[in-house]
Amino acid sequence: MVGRLKESPSQEMIDLLFKPSIRSDLKHHYSYLLKINSVHLFMLKSEGIISDEAASKIHSVLTHLQVTGKEALSINPALEDLYFNVEAYIIEQTGPEIGGQMHTGRSRNDILATVTRMRIREEMLEIYELVCTLRRTLIDLATEHTSTLMTGYTHLQPAEPITFAHYLSALLHGFERDFTRLYNCYAHINKSPLGSCALASTTFSINRKFTMELLGFADLLENSLDGIASRDYALEALSALSIFSNSLSRFAQDLYTWCSYEFGYLEVGHSVAVISSIMPQKKNPVTLEHIKAKAGHIQGALVSSLSVLKNTLYSHSRDTSMESMKYTWEAINETKAAIRLMIKTLQTLTVHKDNMAATTRQNFSTVTELANALVRHYHFSFRTAHHIVAEIVNETLNQGLGSDKIEASTVERAIKQVTAKTVSVTKEFVEQALDPERNISLRTVRGGSAPVEVARQLQQLEQTLASDHQKISDLKQALQSADQLYKHYAAELERGAQ
């Protein structure tokens, strides 16, 4: 019999709900729960709500649990959760009149809300560092390839010549925004719900700011009901993770395509590929396949959490506090795995520069600049020049040739056909207009693909990355300072017990 219940939990409740939850909490939440217990205890003593003697005895048991680890507990799943098992152990060691004081002025509702925020805060910090490592890897790779010629594609058709660095710079700008979105989640995560109690706070004169500071939170949730009901911070994090995973998946798809034999632009290393059981020639870039798939899992977690929360009351319930968070942790793990796989894949990447350049010279991606040259030198309107070059492309393709074989006579015939004008075109004019390196070098406008402009972009990306590293360092330093304060109060309590 527990509380007002006259029967023990059913075996189904124990096997399907309590045991899995306790296993997960022991693995992931044990240290957070003990720290919350200790901080709440320090506060109760500081405010004179419990005696120094009671605080000292309880703290001694909590310290033992921290030092010994979860193995110190003999878990009884019928007690429902990890909190009740910890409390039962403390009461067993100190007696009900001492150990029972630990729960003064709080509820499992605000405890679990606090645990969840502390865990997701730590997980997000790890993701911030991984995203920055990915950006560092990309900046280093781009710096090596500011002059590496390649084709830019739209609709997966040759469009215009760019450099590999210009492509990577585009991704870096996207990942920079992803970092900002992920970082901005932290301010909403890092607010303390502790002291909200069940939902209406408490009649004990607790000091919420005290526990907030020792647990490393930057602010308080100002409404006790909101403190135990809110899970929007998790949805916000899942949304940012989903957007980031989408960016990462699109990147993986490009690499995957360019690693094919038909493109032959890139090749992943042997350490990140697998073979076929039957086809000897195979070297499959499977890390990219997993990265793409993991984006689906992450986005599915967002939809799952939204779906669970949408019909819950704005208060505490198990579907709010537990079921809605079920796949959040999996999404976080999938995100970390996807980033690590991408970093490793990039570190092994071989760029086949010759293939990239040869394809770009032949696949008509340079002919837009031929149209531009006709506008500048022969004063055609751009639309007329567009028609002329379209005729040139058709004639060249019909001859089974590439754009590197376009001749001055071909241009003259197309001009005659479209405008009925006879114009003399030199070989040098055509070669210069179709030269991909020259084509790219002229694109010096801000954001353009000229090597000098891409170098400027990379320098700016480098500066922002350094700033973002500092932001992470500041967040970690704040937690370390809070931990030092926590250790101060722990030592003070231990000295008083001597």
Swiss-Prot record:
PANTHER family from the UniProt entry: ARGININOSUCCINATE LYASE
GO BP: arginine biosynthetic process via ornithine; L-arginine biosynthetic process
The family this protein is said to belong to: Belongs to the lyase 1 family. Argininosuccinate lyase subfamily.
Gene3D superfamilies the record matches: Fumarase/aspartase (C-terminal domain) (1.10.40.30), Fumarase/aspartase (Central domain) (1.20.200.10), Fumarase/aspartase (N-terminal domain) (1.10.275.10)
Annotated Gene Ontology cellular component terms: cytosol
GO MF terms held by the record: argininosuccinate lyase activity
Keyword annotations from UniProtKB, A to Z: Amino-acid biosynthesis, Arginine biosynthesis, Cytoplasm, Lyase
Presence of keyword RNA-binding: no
Enzyme class: lyase
Listed pathway(s): Amino-acid biosynthesis; L-arginine biosynthesis; L-arginine from L-ornithine and carbamoyl phosphate: step 3/3
UniProt catalytic activity: 2-(N(omega)-L-arginino)succinate = fumarate + L-arginine
Protein name, entry field: Argininosuccinate lyase 1
Cell compartment(s), UniProt: Cytoplasm
Residues of the signal peptide: none
